[in-house]
Amino acid sequence: MYRYKIRNKWNIALRICLFLLCISSSLHAREIDLSTSRLLVSNSIQSPVKETIIRVLQEEIDKRAGIYPDITDTWEGTSIIALALSSDDSLNGRALPEKAKLSLKAESFSVIVEEAPSQTIIWLVGVDARGVLFAAGHLLRTSLFAGKQFLFDPSNAIKSEPEYPIRGHQLGYRDTANSYDAWSKEQYEQYIRELAIFGTNCIETIPFDNTPSPHMKVSKEEMNRHISTVCKNYGLDYWVWTPVNVDLSDESLFQAEVKKHSDYYRRCPYLSHVFVPGGDPGDNHPRYVIPFLKAIAGELKKQHPQAGVWISLQGFSDEQIDYFYHYLETESPDWLRGVVSGPGSPPLSDTRYRLPQKYMHRHYADITHTVRCLYPTLRWDQAFALTLGREPVNPQPFYYAVLHDRYAPFTDGFLAYSDGAHDDLNKCIWSRKGWSKKEDAIGITEQYVRFFFGINSGDRVADAILGLERNWDGPIEANGGIEMTFSRWQQLEQAYPRSQEDWRWQMLLLRAYYDTYVKRRKLYEQALERGANDLLAQAPEIGSEEAMKLALKKITEADRINIAPQLRTKIEDYCEALYHSVGLQTSVGKYRASGPERGCVLDFVDYPLNNRWWL
């Protein structure tokens, strides 16, 4: 009887599994084939954003599937991707779906599927041009491109609006960047495009940094004009970060600085916001900073009437902070758009509490650094801190998702600090979290893998990326996951040879090899030190000089014998590949990085992990 019950339960379980498998198969079969799609576009979408969206769809689909969707002005064909505004009553004689009715919140969009026996229509409907861009981004992120196929699951149809109006990243074309300064105009546009596909709506640059870089392909003036134009074409906000490094109490210096801004505003083709940090750098009292901001706001309005001026309270004393808020309370200036909170600022919660509601509040979050920074990596082994340093490849989806959700409620969004491509996944995490707090780190990472590598979730590449984050959790000696993650990345390295030319893939593999190399070295070198200490303990028997001689010979074996030369070679290979693919400068000597803290992981790859330098 007992065996019968058990057998019966197994039969029931088996039937359930088969049923679920059938459902799964049918769901997969429900994917819509858009391989023959053409684009039908509403003329009411504002130019030049309309033309940019068309180009984005055509080029990104072509890259992934070898399919170039043509533009059409008719509804003929088996599949149509229709782009329209929610204010349109119809598109080429066909009424928009009822689901296309959107709220008036800027950037809102719908992706709607209409199926008939002879035709499928994918509607990309935005409340504005930027909404249509983000609808296109949703389609690209959630579609599956396999061979010559372009597939979309109807369950990914959506009606969506952003939670935070500011979602951006600083991409300063300057010498201290670990990669941006080596980029071409085409690379900058492609990167901005990819950030927009993930929901970014603003980009910030640094126009007044005159330090030359040996990597720059064009002048900083030309590149900043180009980035400004790219933002205009994509319908994104363009910010500039403009610290004041002169004494504003000196009237002549004050006027010269105002003129510098005025001249720049005239030359800049498109500008949305000007951010002047109160400090870091700069040490002017707000009694001088505020009149300066008012003066440049007047100049800004002449050239860019819709643009706004922002200030941060970075480095301000309590007296200076009180001075600033007293000014806002008594004067309530309309020329000030908002306040930025960054490293060295008062807490975000305090700023939002004291800041009058008419002013916006932006988070200047540091998502690029691991140590000596606003949000240092938690429980990071000292061996990683000594070798990887402050600016390594640092995909940390869980950590940065938590940080975003912790601080976002006190702000109107973020424009994050970044000094290179190494924090690429963190940018995508914040861009998606800024759109919706309901999105989680795993889901965003899976979108990242699908869009950039064309790999579906079945190969668990997202898990391998999350494994790199877990590599940094706690003492190396106790972290058995480092070797497991490395083994998985070696399998992926062999399974996807075509991805070897992709800089994002190269960065992840570099980290997998580097983390494992550091762990093996630490275990080896710490064992040598224990052996050296054992030899020193024999001094009473063999004499102190002999004991010291043997101990030094033992502990310095690490300088003569490399425990993992194959891993070391792979690290060099990936550093070389990344220099050529994305301009990543991992060495001061070899790749002319601006300084050892700027991502120079190759220069510190063999940094001692025992005390041999001090014995």
Across the structure, where does each feature detected by a protein language model lie?
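Structural motif
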Residues: 41-46, 83-89, 125-127, 173, ...
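Acidic, contiguous N-terminal accessory segments
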Residues: 14, 18-23, 27-115, 152-155
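Terminal accessory regions of large proteins
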Residues: 464-479, 485-615
